[in-house]
A protein has these predicted regions:
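Sec-dependent, cleavable N-terminal signal peptides
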Residues: 1-25
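Extracellular, repeat-based ectodomains that mediate carbohydrate processing or recognition
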Residues: 26-190
Length: 190
C-alpha cells in the first residue's frame, strides 16, 4: 500500500512539473501544433511564406503539374484558424525553388526556377484582404492583352535554390545557384 502511495505521488509530481505551461511556452522549449490546413491536395513543394499584414500571409509554391502558384491565407493571431483567401497560377509550366519577398507598399517580388530551370523574377500586388494581382508574371507572355507584361528571365541557364531579400524600397538582392551550380548574387531594381 505504501508503494502505491509513493508511486501516486511521483506520478502527480511529474504531471504537475512536466505538463506544458503558457509561462514557459515562448522560450522555444515546447513546440505544439495548433492547427493545420491542407491548401493543395495534389502538390505543395518549394514553399516560401511571407507576412502581408497582421493576419494575412502569402505563400509561393510549386503546385499541380509543377506549375507556379501564389496563395494567400488569413491566420488568426493565436494560430487557431487558417482560411485560404486567393490563389493565382503565375506560371503554367514550372515554379520551383521559390523565394517571395515584400518590396514596398503592397508589392511583392518572387524569384523562382521556371521553364528549363531558368531563373525568373515576377511581381505582384497583394492587398490587406489577401487579393493577389499580377504585375509581371510568366503567364503574361502567353496572352495578347496589351497591358500584360512578361516577367524577367534573369538567368537563361539555371536559377535554382533562390534566396531573395529586400535591400531598400526598390532594390532586391538574390542569391541562387546558376550555371554549373555556381553561386551567384544579383541585385535588381523593381
Amino acid at each position: 500500500m505504501q508503494m502505491k502511495v509513493i508511486l501516486s505521488i511521483m506520478v502527480l509530481f511529474s504531471l504537475v512539473f512536466l505538463l506544458p505551461s503558457d509561462a514557459y511556452a515562448n522560450d522555444g522549449s515546447i513546440i505544439l501544433e495548433t492547427t493545420s490546413l491542407e491548401h493543395d491536395a495534389r502538390q505543395g513543394q518549394y514553399n516560401s511564406l511571407v507576412q502581408v499584414d497582421s493576419d494575412t500571409y502569402a505563400l509561393a509554391y510549386e503546385g499541380k503539374d509543377k506549375d507556379g502558384f501564389i496563395s494567400t491565407f488569413t491566420i488568426s493571431s493565436d494560430g487557431s484558424s487558417i482560411v485560404e483567401v486567393d490563389t493565382l497560377e503565375h506560371d503554367d509550366d514550372h515554379g520551383q525553388y521559390n523565394s517571395l519577398v515584400h518590396v514596398v507598399s503592397d508589392t511583392y517580388a518572387l524569384a523562382y526556377a521556371g521553364t528549363n530551370d531558368d531563373g525568373f523574377i515576377s511581381t505582384f500586388t497583394i492587398d490587406s484582404e489577401g487579393v493577389i494581382t499580377p504585375i509581371q508574371i510568366q503567364n503574361h507572355a502567353n496572352t495578347d492583352t496589351v497591358d500584360d507584361v512578361a516577367n524577367l528571365e534573369h538567368d537563361i541557364v539555371q536559377g535554382q535554390y533562390n534566396s531573395l531579400v529586400q535591400i531598400n524600397s526598390n532594390t532586391i538582392a538574390l542569391a541562387y545557384a546558376g550555371t554549373n551550380d555556381d553561386g551567384f548574387i544579383s541585385t535588381f531594381t523593381i
